[in-house]
C-alpha cells in the first residue's frame, strides 16, 4: 500500500510512502468507512491545486503521512473508490463512490448528511474547507450510472464544473460589455469546456484562444474558438476591442504582453489556473509590470457553486450542470484520448510530464490502482 506525496515547495519532487491498511482498518471508529481507491485522474488542474496549496488550503484535505518536517503534501485528485469496511448503517461494503481523494490506495472517511445520492465527509480537519470538495457521490443512487464513463468523469467533471461556472459568471455579468473573450492556455481542458460552452451561447462575444505554437493545430481542430493565436504571434490580438481575459496559465509574459497591448480595453482578467505555475516566482520585469492587477482577480469555482446552489437550490444547480456536462462529455469523445497508468510506480514516471506541461493536450491520464 502506498501514498504518493509531492514536495510543497517544488512540485517536480515526489516520493512514495508505504502505508498500513491493516492499521487503518483496526483504527476504524464508529461512524467511519474505509475505502479502496480504484482509479483517479491527473491533469494540470491538480498542478494548480499544488501551486495554490497553501493560499487556498488544498494541502489540508489529506495530511501526508510520515511528514514530520511538513515538507510533503498530498495533491488531491478526483476518482472512484469502493467501500471495503463500514461502521455506518446504510453504507455497505462494495458500494462505489465518486469524489475527492488523496493519490493513495485507501482513505478513511466519516460520512455525514447521508442521503441515497451522496454524503459529506465530516472529518474535523476538513470542516472549514470548501464543501464542494467534501461531497461524495454514491453510484448506487444514480439511476443512469454508466461505469464505462468513469474515466471521462474523473478527468473532465472537475474541470467542466469550473468551465460551467465561468460560462455562468460571464453570462451573468453580460460579458462585462466585452466584444471578445480572450482565453489563455486555450488547449487546457477547462478552457476547452469554457469555449464550447460559449459557442453554445448565441449572445456570447467572439472567443479568442491563445496557445503554444505546438498546440495550435489541435486547438483549431476543436472548432469552438473564433480565432486561435499562438504565443509567438500575440501582436495579432485585436487590441482595439474591449476584452475580457480568462487566464488558465499564470504566464506572466503572455499576460503582461496582452494587458499592455489592450490597455484600457482590458476590462477584466479572470485568473483561474496555473498551467505555467513555474512562472509565478519570476522576478518582476517590464512585461510583468504591465499586468493590470487592479482589474484582475482569482476565480474560485467552489464559491460560485455555493452561490448558485443558494440561488437555484441543489436540484436546480444539478439540472443545469448535468446538462452542461452531458454536452461536453459527448463532445470530448471526438478529441480526448484516455491513457491508463497502472499503479504508482508507473505514475511516478509520467508525473513530471504533467507538472512541467509536456503532456499532449488531447491526452488524459487515469491511474488504475
Predicted regions and their residues:
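A short N-terminal beta-strand-loop micro-motif at the entrance of redox/enzyme domains
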Residues: 10-40, 44-46
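Glycine-rich beta-strand-centered segment in the early N-terminal region that forms part
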Residues: 26-40, 54-107
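NAD(P)H dinucleotide-binding glycine-rich loop of Rossmann-like/cofactor-binding domains
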Residues: 100-179
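N-terminal Rossmann-fold NAD(P) dinucleotide-binding loop
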Residues: 191-192
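Adenosine-nucleotide cofactor-binding segment
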Residues: 199-255
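Short acidic-hydrophobic, aromatic-tinged amphipathic segments that line or gate anion-handling sites
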Residues: 226-236, 300-301, 338-343
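Glycine-rich phosphate-binding loop and adjacent beta-alpha segment
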Residues: 257-330
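C-terminal hydrophobic helical "lid"/dimerization subdomain
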Residues: 306-369
Amino acid at each position: 500500500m502506498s501514498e504518493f506525496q509531492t514536495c510543497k515547495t517544488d512540485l517536480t519532487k515526489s516520493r512514495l510512502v508505504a502505508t498500513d491498511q491493516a492499521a487503518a482498518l483496526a483504527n476504524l471508529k464508529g461512524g467511519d468507512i474505509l475505502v479502496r481507491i480504484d482509479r483517479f485522474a491527473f491533469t494540470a488542474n491538480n498542478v494548480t491545486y499544488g501551486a495554490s496549496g497553501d493560499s487556498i488550503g488544498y494541502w489540508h484535505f489529506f495530511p501526508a503521512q510520515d511528514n514530520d518536517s511538513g515538507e510533503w503534501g498530498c495533491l488531491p485528485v478526483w476518482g472512484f473508490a469502493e467501500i471495503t469496511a463500514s461502521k455506518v448503517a446504510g453504507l455497505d461494503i462494495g458500494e462505489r463512490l465518486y469524489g475527492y481523494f488523496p493519490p493513495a490506495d485507501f482513505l478513511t472517511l466519516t460520512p455525514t448528511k447521508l442521503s441515497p445520492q451522496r454524503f459529506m465527509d465530516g472529518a474535523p480537519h476538513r470542516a472549514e474547507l470548501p464543501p464542494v470538495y467534501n461531497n461524495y457521490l454514491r453510484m448506487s443512487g444514480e439511476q443512469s450510472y454508466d461505469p464505462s464513463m468513469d474515466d471521462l468523469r474523473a478527468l473532465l467533471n472537475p474541470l467542466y464544473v469550473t468551465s460551467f461556472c465561468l460560462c455562468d459568471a460571464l453570462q451573468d455579468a453580460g460579458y462585462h460589455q466585452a466584444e471578445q473573450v480572450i482565453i489563455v492556455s486555450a488547449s487546457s481542458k477547462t478552457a476547452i469546456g469554457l469555449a464550447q460552452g460559449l459557442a453554445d451561447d448565441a449572445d456570447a462575444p467572439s472567443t479568442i484562444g491563445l496557445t503554444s505554437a505546438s498546440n495550435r493545430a489541435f486547438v483549431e481542430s476543436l472548432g469552438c474558438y473564433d480565432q486561435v493565436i499562438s504565443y509567438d504571434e500575440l501582436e495579432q490580438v485585436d487590441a482595439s476591442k474591449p476584452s475580457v481575459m480568462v487566464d488558465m496559465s499564470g504566464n506572466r509574459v503572455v499576460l503582461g504582453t496582452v494587458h499592455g497591448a489592450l490597455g484600457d480595453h482590458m476590462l477584466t482578467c479572470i485568473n483561474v489556473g496555473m498551467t505555467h505555475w513555474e512562472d509565478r516566482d519570476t522576478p518582476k520585469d517590464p512585461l510583468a509590470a504591465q499586468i493590470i492587477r487592479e482589474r484582475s482577480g482569482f476565480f474560485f469555482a467552489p464559491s460560485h457553486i455555493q452561490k448558485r446552489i443558494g440561488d437555484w437550490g441543489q436540484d436546480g444547480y444539478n439540472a443545469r450542470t448535468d446538462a452542461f456536462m452531458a454536452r461536453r462529455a459527448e463532445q470530448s469523445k471526438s478529441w480526448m484520448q484516455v491513457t491508463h497508468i497502472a499503479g504508482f510506480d508507473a505514475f511516478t514516471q509520467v508525473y513530471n510530464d504533467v507538472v512541467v506541461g509536456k503532456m499532449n493536450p488531447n491526452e488524459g491520464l487515469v491511474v488504475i490502482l
